[in-house]
């Protein structure tokens, strides 16, 4: 299934967080914070005020967007204004 965000929205895929602490303690899902880093999967046609493209890694607002599941994969549809930064490695 192909999903194309409308207007000034992006489709992002949250990045998996480490399940262990530095001390080796395994964290259950209920103890982990919601991830705030994601990879851009699709960009709406009216996104103009930020410089992101498919494949970029970004940091987004903690409670932003609408969570959806496509083919058993979690995604978030988010407004372009909720993108806080681009991660460059």
Curated annotation (Swiss-Prot):
Q: Which domain of life is it from?
A: Bacteria
| Keyword annotations from UniProtKB, A to Z | Chaperone, Cytoplasm
Q: Which family does it belong to?
A: Belongs to the GroES chaperonin family.
Q: What is the protein name for this chain?
A: Co-chaperonin GroES
A molecular function annotated in GO for this UniProt entry is:
protein folding chaperone
**What is one GO biological process annotated to this record?**
chaperone cofactor-dependent protein refolding
PANTHER family, per database record? 10 KDA HEAT SHOCK PROTEIN (PTHR10772), 20 KDA CHAPERONIN, CHLOROPLASTIC (PTHR10772:SF63)
Q: Which Pfam families match?
A: Cpn10
Task: Quote the SMART domains the UniProt record gives.
Answer: Cpn10
Matching entries from InterPro entries are given as:
Chaperonin_GroES, Chaperonin_GroES_sf, Chaprnonin_Cpn10_CS, GroES-like_sf
**A GO cellular-component term linked to this record:** cytoplasm
Q: Which PROSITE patterns match?
A: CHAPERONINS_CPN10 (PS00681)
Where does it live in the cell?
A: Cytoplasm
Quaternary state and partners of this protein?
Heptamer of 7 subunits arranged in a ring. Interacts with the chaperonin GroEL.
**Role summary:** Together with the chaperonin GroEL, plays an essential role in assisting protein folding. The GroEL-GroES system forms a nano-cage that allows encapsulation of the non-native substrate proteins and provides a physical environment optimized to promote and accelerate protein folding. GroES binds to the apical surface of the GroEL ring, thereby capping the opening of the GroEL channel.
């Amino acid at each position: 299934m192909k999903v194309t965000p409308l207007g000034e929205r992006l489709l992002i895929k949250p990045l998996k967080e480490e399940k262990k602490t530095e001390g080796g303690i395994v964290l259950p899902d209920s103890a982990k914070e919601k991830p705030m880093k994601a990879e851009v999967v699709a960009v709406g046609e009216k996104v103009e005020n930020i410089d992101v493209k498919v494949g970029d890694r970004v940091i987004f607002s903690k409670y932003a967007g609408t969570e959806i599941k496509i083919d058993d994969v979690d995604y978030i549809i988010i407004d372009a204004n909720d993108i806080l930064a681009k991660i460059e490695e």
